[in-house]
Design a protein with these regions (language model features):
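Extreme N-terminal segment that seeds HTH/winged-HTH DNA-binding domains in transcriptional regulators
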Residues: 1-33, 39, 87, 91-122
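Alpha-helical and His/Cys-centered functional microenvironments
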Residues: 24, 56, 76
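Short, Lys/Arg-rich nucleic-acid/phosphate-binding segment
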Residues: 34, 66-74, 78-79
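Hydrophobic alpha-helical segments, especially transmembrane helices
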Residues: 39, 52-54, 69, 73, ...
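A general secondary-structure boundary signal
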Residues: 48, 61-64, 71-73, 116, ...
Length: 122
């Protein structure tokens, strides 16, 4: 999974979202240890201070926690991860519906089209 950034929002906020996505998708395992700040910053091609800022914010939310000599770990709170997963999905759906509306689809037409395409993909 590559790290993709745009110029519309601060990088650290995009890092937070992408780390959350990696957690809910299983790239980073629940209860598992995260790579070091430097390693993650290198992988994402960002400044380590920017990565540190994102990880500090994730710690503040409780999704990630530090153990002094062992590094950072992902919470095992499945409810928290489910809430984050649903939040990420909601954002994607809202963007999708907004874009479909921009090209002239009503919500009902969009739902019908999604159902048709979903059946075709099976």
């Amino acid at each position: 999974m590559s790290w993709n950034f745009n110029d519309e929002r601060p990088i650290y906020l995009q890092l937070i979202e992408q780390i959350q996505l990696r957690i809910v998708s299983g790239v980073y395992k629940v209860g598992g240890k995260l790579p070091s700040v430097r390693e993650m910053a290198s992988d994402a091609s960002v400044n380590p201070n920017t990565m540190q800022k994102a990880l500090t914010e994730l710690e503040r939310t409780g999704l990630v926690f530090s153990q002094r000599t062992s590094g950072r770990f992902i919470t095992e709170d499945s409810n928290m991860i489910k809430v984050i997963r649903n939040g990420l999905a909601k954002e994607q759906i809202e963007k999708f519906l907004y874009n479909m509306e921009k090209i002239g689809y009503t919500k009902q037409e969009t739902i019908q089209l999604v159902e048709i395409i979903s059946k075709e993909m099976k």
